[in-house]
Amino acid sequence: MSCARITVTLPYRSAKTSIQRGITHYPALIRPRFSACTPLASAMPLSSTPLINGDNSQRKNTRQHMEESSSKRREYLLEETTRKLQRNDTESVEKLKLIDNIQQLGIGYYFEDAINAVLRSPFSTGEEDLFTAALRFRLLRHNGIEISPEIFLKFKDERGKFDESDTLGLLSLYEASNLGVAGEEILEEAMEFAEARLRRSLSEPAAPLHGEVAQALDVPRHLRMARLEARRFIEQYGKQSDHDGDLLELAILDYNQVQAQHQSELTEIIRWWKELGLVDKLSFGRDRPLECFLWTVGLLPEPKYSSVRIELAKAISILLVIDDIFDTYGEMDDLILFTDAIRRWDLEAMEGLPEYMKICYMALYNTTNEVCYKVLRDTGRIVLLNLKSTWIDMIEGFMEEAKWFNGGSAPKLEEYIENGVSTAGAYMAFAHIFFLIGEGVTHQNSQLFTQKPYPKVFSAAGRILRLWDDLGTAKEEQERGDLASCVQLFMKEKSLTEEEARSRILEEIKGLWRDLNGELVYNKNLPLSIIKVALNMARASQVVYKHDQDTYFSSVDNYVDALFFTQ
């Protein structure tokens, strides 16, 4: 989670922090419309109010009436959709398609109980075709429900091949295979077969489902960031001749309402950031609250996590400036003092710091303690030790990177990745989210943030973040003179070309996704809410950093505009 940095002559630089790279300005909260995104049409968009004639009182009353009308309509649509999910006379495959559309439109959080009831109910597999079997498999695993991949064996012929002519079935199979777990050879073979056939179909002008196939091969459904996918699919779904008008209307109303909520959250974050005044005092620091907020929406797309997004965006914004101290400004002796002060975590430790470090230390100290107070107030839990441990771990990681650069020696590949997960901000983010959400927290699992190794679900997501970060910014790192990146270290240790190193890293990411898929279905030690956050971190990483050229800044700027400012 990293942002762009100013150019300064340095004694050393460390690897950048990954929760942070991008938006260069925010002169006003509401920006011009983003031309690459089609505005969402709705009978009554909640994110913009039409001009109303009359005095302020009349306008206020009219606006209130419109909002009440929209709210009533929304409640009606929610009830109608719930009834459709609960109807006994609807074929199972139609319910699966409905669930798939609901979740892709970004409104699945309204129907979690009804969706789980459908997915856990008996399903007749006698006449099931490949499309339906793969859809059912994907939906079950996506929602954390166990299902065996052996259901696909019956679709193989005597040569062990699937039907190459069934494009719809192969597309569904390919999407399902992306939820495979390590050791599931059936799904690995299915992915290889389906991907090869689907890629060949793209060269056939009259091939069916050309657009859907191209999208799936670019980024499979399971790997897409929820809110961006909701926006994209709302526009696509409305063009389908058989779309459900009520479902589309509900999705648009909800999207506009969530966008208005995000704008309100951004207003609070930017107000806090300006009052904090950190970058006013530290002119070298990056000023990126908008992008920090984008990451929180990627990790926590559900509206109910509003306060968690706000607190996490604050933490990431401060982390960004600390990264700049280590990466572009601080002298080695000062960094040693700062690291020691973070370990001590008291105000007395701040006294020995240089002036420019004191304000940053105080901002971190106060903001973290405020989060701890809110958790104590809301849940009765004392979590300072847990949060503090992840901050100390991260700052020590920055210090380690500084030593690598200052000493002129590159680390080993595994050493770099393991340290880079921490300096990427992954564990700090998970700790804040886990305790701020507060679901399923026990004494036993709360200790997972005070000792190493961290849980596999967190380290796998963090490794994906680090690997995608390095893939997306390798050119920038090389030009900046960084001693280490995953690409460079793969090339050095494995004697690979840059292209070969990138391919190896992509294979590594695939393997880590299999680990995450296993955690989604089989991890019983952590609540599903935090496991989903881990998968969302991996998704957001790919969305932000996956590109063929160094186009990070424009892409992140586009995402911010599309999600928060384009109606």
Swiss-Prot record:
Transit peptide start and end: 1-63
Keywords: Chloroplast, Hydrolase, Magnesium, Manganese, Metal-binding, Plastid, Transit peptide
Pathway where it operates: Secondary metabolite biosynthesis; terpenoid biosynthesis
Binding locations of Mn(2+) 3: D469, T473, E477
Co-factor note (free text): Binds 3 Mn(2+) ions per subunit.
Matches recorded under CDD domains: Terpene_cyclase_plant_C1
Catalytic activity: (2E)-geranyl diphosphate + H2O = (2E)-geraniol + diphosphate
One GO CC term, this protein: chloroplast
Gene3D superfamilies from the UniProt entry: Farnesyl Diphosphate Synthase, Terpene synthase, N-terminal domain
Residues that hold Mn(2+) 1 according to the record: D323, D327
Binding site for (2E)-geranyl diphosphate: R286, D323, D327, R466, D469
Tissues expressing this chain: Expressed in the peltate glandular trichomes of the leaves.
Cofactor(s) needed: Mn(2+)
Motif stretch (DDXXD motif): 323-327
Pfam families given in the database record: Terpene_synth (PF01397), Terpene_synth_C (PF03936)
Function statement: Monoterpene synthase that catalyzes the formation of geraniol from geranyl diphosphate.
Name the record gives this protein: Geraniol synthase, chloroplastic
Organism (species): Ocimum basilicum (Sweet basil)
